[in-house]
Amino acid sequence: MIRKYRYGTPFNTEALTEKIETTEGVLPYGEVSQEEGFVFTYIMDEDDIVYGLGEANRGINKRGYCYISNCTDDPVHTEDKRSLYGAHNFIVVSGKTTFGLFFDYPSELTFDIGYTRMDTLKVSCENADLDIYVIEGENAYDIVKQFRHVIGRSYIPPKFAFGFGQSRWGYTTKEDFRAVAKGYRENHIPIDMIYMDIDYMQSFKDFTVNEENFPDFPEFVQEMDDQDIRLIPIIDAGVKVEPGYEIYEEGVKNNYFCKREDGSDFVAAVWPGDTHFPDMLNPEARKWFGDKYRFLIEQGIEGFWNDMNEPAIFYSSEGLAEARELAGKFAKDTEGKTHPWEMQDKMLSIANNPEAVSYTHLRAHETLSD
């Protein structure tokens, strides 16, 4: 059985494919406080196990640590990290009392699972605008089955995707890929896929192929396929700002990119330099960007590596300007007024700085609410 409890005015994430009516009253488990944002608290039994949160750090039992749903482009997965690439706000408390909780909330959400207090599960967020789904069943398996039913059937990859794939930055020509395939075959190591990083593109532009390095690209795709190896090209979430580039021109013309508060297209740097980001909260933009994959599908490509979509940014123009200004002050400072640690913190924070992209979320939220 699944019950929905509503707090405030939630943002419609479209996470569920089935509509569940709101249940009146209080949650059957734990307590809720809305004095400072939103806080859910549940006292755990000594033997309770907490499962869930998708691809996160540490073991299967999430008890004993603090996790933050805040998608982050961080390749260093040390145990002290609290956020990784994805955010899956679903947990199952398994013990004398077993139940599942799904927090339908699109922004930063903190799961303190026996970290601050060993017996306390605490889930908190800044704004009390969310839906909570309470899932009860015969056991943890039944709870997960019910949850998967309401979020829709998962995508089932093709058979080759369950095989081994080789991925490495720096393969720039056909010969590089042929050498990799040959090495695996000669050493009797199975291989089903070779990933193509950004070097296959023309100037790192989405939905392009470097024709100098990959002439007759469809024939090369078929050559690899004849060896039962699929080429899996990368597609980044950033579209290069370049007048005359078809994807850029179409996105600007049709307002498909994320906006700044003043209505202009948000600019930040990733691999191609200055880029715009498709507004995936806009259904028309989603369809437009998705249709562009046909460019590669029609050349024989059967799978893709979607990257940089946390979103990941190297720097924004505002962040870079602030860093340059501070660097100038630091260079001229002969009295030690600008501390070296301040300089270090500024340089380290220009990448993936949430302050640089927060207004795109706000703008999108306002647009969809109108």
Where is each model-derived feature located?
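Catalytic and substrate-binding clefts that recognize carbohydrates or anionic sugar/phosphate headgroups
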Residues: 1-158, 168-169, 174, 181-186
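N-terminal leader/propeptide and maturation segments of large enzyme subunits in energy/redox metabolism
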Residues: 318-324, 328-359
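Conserved small/polar residues in nucleotide/adenosyl-binding loops
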Residues: 360-367
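Gly/Pro- and small hydrophobic-enriched strand-loop and loop-to-helix capping segments
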Residues: 370
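Surface-exposed loop/turn and secondary-structure junction residues enriched for glycine/proline
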Residues: 56, 63, 71, 88, ...
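Aromatic-lined carbohydrate-binding/catalytic grooves of carbohydrate-active enzymes
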Residues: 155, 159-303, 308-317
